[in-house]
Amino acid sequence: MARPAIPDEHAPDLRIVGPGELQALTELCRRCLPDPPDAEELSGTLFAGDRPALVRGDPAVGVVATEVEGDQGFVKLLCVDPKIQGNGLGHRLLAAAEADLAAAGATSVTIGADAPYFLYPGVETTQTAMISLLERHHYARVEANFNMEIDLGRIPPDPGGATVAALEEHDALDAWTAEHWPNWRLEVLRALGKGTLAVSREPGGDSGSGGDSGSGGGGYRSFCAYDVNRKGTLGPVAVRPDLMGKGAGVAALLHALHRMRAAGYAKAEVLWVGPVVPYARVGGRVNRVFFVYRRFLP
């Protein structure tokens, strides 16, 4: 089936878009997306100093943002103004993204699962137009991720035993997360810098000692980050491997949830959920499902 041609008046030059056009990008997302990121969230995801994305298009009508990690390419955002959807701009943007990623050495393109700085863990199942676009370009559905929602008015009491990590713990936390969860390292450090990283430690733990061993009273047990890439969201969350299944993550999780409630949030959305049980125990329920799509480049 032939793709519809985009009218000349809606055929923008697919140029590089920079942080100076952040407000226009934000307004485009408001028109396009059911859960649009605000300017701060877009800036932190697309224009992070340590991992900037390549944003291409025209923020008045449509853009695509890409990133390369080794030989893997990722599309972090693709949106087209609803007024001109169906005229071929989405196809042009996706083709431009593939060309940019191929030029950067990518052998595959993935939509979703683009940690550490991401807006969505995939394509939400309600986004029929986006799913159709990807299928027409022969993208395969490779996995599903989901979020859970927690009503902060009904969470259990904070049991104590967790605190907000201090900036002075940077090196200890960096080493700890790099050893066990390297894919979450940058998100953890971003949360640390924002003051949104709850950690629990071995009894008598010193905030600066870190490490895995509790013999000296300083080992970290778990962490729970929130407000990392999107406001009102929870994650990543992790428990020291030797303590998995022993309830060691409850203190950090509940401390983070109570801090979110104190900050004025009515609900928390847990992103890209792994195990369901820890969040179900504090009232969480699955509320959104996202598909991850991938295509290998020729």
Model regions and ranges:
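Intrinsically disordered, low-complexity terminal tails and inter-domain linkers enriched
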Residues: 3-10, 202-217
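A short, internal acetyl-CoA/4′-phosphopantetheine-binding micro-motif in the GNAT/acyltransferase core
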Residues: 75-85, 114-116, 237-245, 274
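A conserved beta-strand-loop-helix scaffold within acyl/acetyltransferase catalytic domains
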Residues: 36-54, 62-72, 181-203, 216-241
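Short amphipathic alpha-helix that is part of the acyltransferase structural core
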Residues: 2-42, 145-146, 155-185
